[in-house]
Amino acid sequence: MAYKCARCKRTVEVDYEYAGVRCPYCGHRILMKERPTTVKRMKAI
């Protein structure tokens, strides 16, 4: 699953086997889950 680093804004793939979650580029620990590019449309009631 792809995440985006809050500091350097790069896309990061997280390895869940590794104990900690960090950006490999800047070392920042806050990662945001990227939203899909598709738009969901719902019919109004």
Curated annotation (Swiss-Prot):
Cofactor binding comment, as recorded = Binds 1 zinc ion.
Gene encoding it?
A: rpo12
Name the predominant localization: cytoplasm
| Binding-site residues for Zn(2+), renumbered to this chain | C8, C23, C26
Q: What class of enzyme is it?
A: transferase
Q: What is this protein called?
A: DNA-directed RNA polymerase subunit Rpo12
The record's listing under InterPro entries reads:
RNAP_P/RPABC4 (IPR006591), RPABC4/Spt4 (IPR029040), Rpo12 (IPR023464)
GO cellular-component term (any)? DNA-directed RNA polymerase complex
- Quaternary form? Part of the RNA polymerase complex.
What is the E.C. number? 2.7.7.6
- Keyword Nucleotide-binding recorded: no
Q: Which protein family is it in?
A: Belongs to the archaeal Rpo12/eukaryotic RPC10 RNA polymerase subunit family.
Location in or out of the cell: Cytoplasm
Instruction: Enumerate the cofactors the protein uses.
Output: Zn(2+)
Alphabetical UniProt keywords: Cytoplasm, DNA-directed RNA polymerase, Metal-binding, Nucleotidyltransferase, Transcription, Transferase, Zinc
| Molecular function GO terms recorded | DNA binding; DNA-directed RNA polymerase activity; zinc ion binding
Give me the reactions it catalyses: RNA(n) + a ribonucleoside 5'-triphosphate = RNA(n+1) + diphosphate
Explain the purpose of this protein: DNA-dependent RNA polymerase (RNAP) catalyzes the transcription of DNA into RNA using the four ribonucleoside triphosphates as substrates.
Protein's organism: Methanothrix thermoacetophila (strain DSM 6194 / JCM 14653 / NBRC 101360 / PT) (Methanosaeta thermophila)
Biological processes annotated in GO:
DNA-templated transcription
